[in-house]
Amino acid sequence: TDDPSQDSIENDAEEDSPGPKLSVRFSKIETLKAKDFSDCSSVELRELHQLIGNLKFSSSKRASLRKRDTKRNPKKLNVSKSIRKAFETDGEPIYLKYSRKDTRPRRLVLLLDVSGSMEPYARALIRLAHAAVVGRADVEAFTLGTRLTRITRELTSRDPDAALRSAADSVRDWSGGTRLGATLAEFNNEWGIRGYARGALLVMLSDGWDRGSPDVLRTQMERLQRVTHRLIWVNPLKHTPGYAPLAQGMAAALPYTDEFIEGHSFDSLERLTEIISS
């Protein structure tokens, strides 16, 4: 005969099965990842900030002037080393030497707009900058508002909360006005053109609102484009239905960007890391 207690055990097992609960949890996380930061509660933002902290920034490579000995690519004959080696065998080129160009990580420069219009997104973007600074070499981070502030050193702490507090304390124009052209000019003159920007992958994170002259911003973007390897503009407003880059700052800057992408959600920032690493 059938044991009625067996049905009870099976029903209990089905109720206790983690499958449906995990599925619901996974669905909620995926929904949260696609949610606009400006629509998130404080609890949701905390969870998203943790996810942002786990994003990986692989280093794209650039060719170095240095060469490395190799046995794998016989097409790259190192003539000078082969001749020197031949002197050890009475001038006979018995041992040929090969080399290839060495590679180095390409510098990543992050410029973050912390003006009032970027308030709903700024903290998530600072979290992103922290993940980049602690996750790979050759990363520089600056904030832009009414002034330029370098925050690379403040973001080097492995503790994300401590790093963000330190960065926030050093940024005096947080949630203030916007002078993108003027602050970009300061970056170009003091840090960028002869240093950090040259050959770098530069990421501008801004909604493009600027109270200054669009001609100034246009000039500074043109200068940046000439020296950077690649210039990416991340705009949190780009995902908005019907959006067009009509703000005078964004319209002035757009012709000098290599890629123009969204930056309003975790999913969009994850896509940015993929572009950076490619």
Language-model-detected regions and their locations in the chain:
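Extended, charge-rich low-complexity interaction segments
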Residues: 163-185, 260-275
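Von Willebrand factor
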Residues: 102-170, 180-186, 201-204, 237
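Von Willebrand factor type A / integrin I
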Residues: 221-278
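C-terminal structural cap/anchor segments
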Residues: 174-208, 213-218
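Acidic/polar low-complexity segments with low predicted structural confidence
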Residues: 1-105
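Extended hydrophobic-aromatic, low-complexity segments
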Residues: 121, 141, 152-153, 193-199, ...
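DG-centered beta-turn motif at the end of beta-strands
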Residues: 83, 111-115, 199-212, 258
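Conserved nucleotide-binding/hydrolysis micro-motifs of P-loop NTPases
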Residues: 146-149, 209-210, 238-240, 267-268
